[in-house]
Amino acid sequence: MGAPSPDRTYRAELQGLRAVAALLVVVYHVWLGRVSGGVDVFFLISGFLVTGQLVRATARGRLDLRTLWSRMAKRLLPAAFVVLAATLAAGALFLPANRWPQTAREVIASALFLENWQLASDSTDYYAQHEQASVVQHFWSLSIQGQFYLLWPLLILVVTLLRRSLLRVLLVVFAASLGCSVWLTAVDQPLAYFHTATRIWEFAFGGLLALVVSRVALPRHWGVLLGWTGLLGLLVCGIVLDVGAAFPGYLALWPTTCAAAVIAAGATGSRFGADRVLASEPLRYLGDLSYALYLWHWPVLVGWLVVQGRGEVGLIGGIAIISASLVLAAATHLLVEEPVRRSRWRARTMVALVLVPLVAAAVVVQPTGPREGAAAQLPADATDFAPFDSQCRKSSHSQELDVCYGLTEGPPTKRVVLVGDSHIQQYLAALAPIAERRGWQLIAMLKGACPFSTRSEKVPGDQSCLRWNDNAAAEIIDLRPDFVFTLATRDVQVGLTEVTPPGFVERWRQLDAAQIPVVAVRDNPRYSFSVLDCVQVHGPVPRCGAPRAELLAPVPPYAHLDVPGNVSFLDFSDHLCTEDQCPPFMGDLLVNFDDNHVSATFMRSLSEVVERALDDVTEA
């Protein structure tokens, strides 16, 4: 997705490879919602081309960093700034007001090529995790690319001045970064996905390829075989591998190795070679558009979803999104990229003329209230979690576990532990008034995307979640509360996918052995779109809800399970949905503030309902 790099040893098949990578990214984003590996191909190609260019420049003794960075800025910045400016303007007109602060913040980060660090920070922020994907979220990869363009020439220059072996240095960078990627993906996958250190090896892989590929002359038939193997392997990568929850890590070797195979195969000269297809005029032209296509497709997709108020695009909608993105990409290439590339503008002047007004505009974009046709202004806690008046300390079992004790007047009559992720946190709004009335002490142990289980339910193999759960269970057994409040079910994805995972039941058995009662609540429905976004665009209309039969099975999944005797179940589905529908509003209260969390305002309105239900399953 990096802009094409001018090179005297131009290889037409690389433009076709860019085109394939861009199409994979777009198609997977629009219809499949999965990682395709296309971005990793862009990283490898950039490493290959830039390293080759730098090595040739140093060999001639003509490595001018100022000129190099200026050329790179003229290739990368114009289209990026145009898309950011257009996105900011369109967002102010069409996005729900609640999305403006996030959009402005990320536009600034993207303009400064720091979006990956913004998203990495959000991935470790308990509250930021629940924000909807912004219209410029895809700039994370461009930010890493920009950082690469800034730092890589310095690395090559230092290695040259110190007369070290570039091959050995790149091997060390490759191994260290790949090792970091594998480790951090296992420990904290959301952070690993956006972290620069976990991606540098992909550029180093391309750099290593640039150093050795010219030394290897493959027989034609081997080149044909290698090229097609790489291309076909790339096309099926996202389908064969469930890469989303374990990426980048070692799985990123698949798309990068496939792309490396295509590059190593080179121009075979065979009419049966993959390079002949990739070097065809349509794919080369699409390769020229690949950077702009990548820039445009995501804001067009997000804008479509917001305006339609749904979470899926369908076949016709997807074709429309891709077509619109291609038209915008072609226009940007013709009217922005090419004129700027041919101009004599200095990169410094261009940045000053565009970046400063863009950042200033993003800073002043703030919500000013509901727009015409939107829902009435909502209270703050209708769009967020309820605050919890508590004092937190680190668990004696682990510094990773925060235990938050609700404040009470005098000795508590009961101690109740809430343990799990945000879907348990939302019940604080209902339980806090009960605790205040009855003199209970609420004790919260919460971790985003980490339900109370013996397994990592949402991110397979997440060691941080596994450790946190083990420590939480040990802390609960030490505390011996009157009962534990946790989830009974979870949705694997949108639709009738609700399950009671075996890991939940195993934790209940562990507490049963310690004679600690468990109250397990059925999870609320998960939508394919943000209910709040839909309401703010379209108002409280039925399209912002969903038929109950599409979200909730008539019988909860735990009904026929063999569970320990210490477990009691609660199900508030009839208060979140009517008999036939799960509407956006019940009465005049917004039910959900995103696609899967109940608003604090609505949850607080259920406090007496929750209290009566608890009386039925616990000692009053």
Please identify what each model-predicted range represents.
Residues 243, 306-334, 338-620:
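Extracellular/periplasmic envelope-modification machinery, especially enzymes
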Residues 1-344, 357-359:
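Membrane-interface helix/loop caps of multi-pass membrane proteins
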